[in-house]
Amino acid sequence: MLGVATLVFALIHLIPGDPAQAMLGETASEQDVQALRERLGLDRPLFEQYGAFLAGIARGDLGTSLRTNEPVATAILDRLPATLELAAAAMVVSIGVAIPLGIIAAVRRGTFLDHLATTLALTGISIPNFWLGPLLAIVFAVELGWLPVAGRGTAAHLVLPAISLGAALAAILARMTRASLLEELREPYVQAARARGTSRARAVLRHAFRNSLIPVVTLVGLQFGGVLTGAVITETIFAWPGVGRLLIQSIGFRDYPLVQGCILFIAMTYVAMNLLTDLAYGVLDPRIRYE
């Protein structure tokens, strides 16, 4: 995390523009801008600002927003439920679509259903969410009027952002599920189960499918960080009041502490998900033991 913190600090301070100038506006005098820079501590050398930044992280203090004077941790925690709600909905959409699609494609390999599932997966991977989001909004919100286009309040507000965010992950998971399940179906133990009279559905779902889940779970854990990153774009498109939108707004205002805090939060969440993924291996495969 030290490397992430250092990289974030360096990149943030390379962004062109002056936070004090952005806060006061273009019409502010040089004296007012300089006074605000001194009050915010932006006139100090970068190494002093960097040291204060690391010391704050060590204390659990991410600093204070330059624009609102609100603690960064408080600002992130206020937006966190919305981001977690969107991320969870996107994961439910992606897993709920991908797993059945991957199973059907593997079991019906070479048939029309397999080709259809493969085509859908390739389409989902090819369409970026910054293009899919506006397309969904135009079709289902503006033209058809079936769903709200922006905001957060009801379950209907969640549908379009969740589909936009989860589509690419669903496509990737479907391909992984298909490939992993096909590999397991070739294993001798599956053939032995079928020879003992086990039905095909039972052999697939009870034996092959469970063993094929390990790479799928790995991918889900790794892609969760991608979901949080994609949420930055999706939340901005649909005006979803989460951490991703907060990050974009703070970049626009050159709010260094808030930008740093949001990026660190995403990085720490990614690390935590990788840890949980490793722990899930032992549940899926009893042969795996941790020392």
Language-model-detected regions and their locations in the chain:
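Membrane-water interface segments at the C-terminal ends of transmembrane alpha-helices
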Residues: 7-14, 44, 55, 119-148, ...
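Hydrophobic alpha-helical transmembrane segments of membrane transport/permease proteins
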Residues: 3-51, 65, 141-160
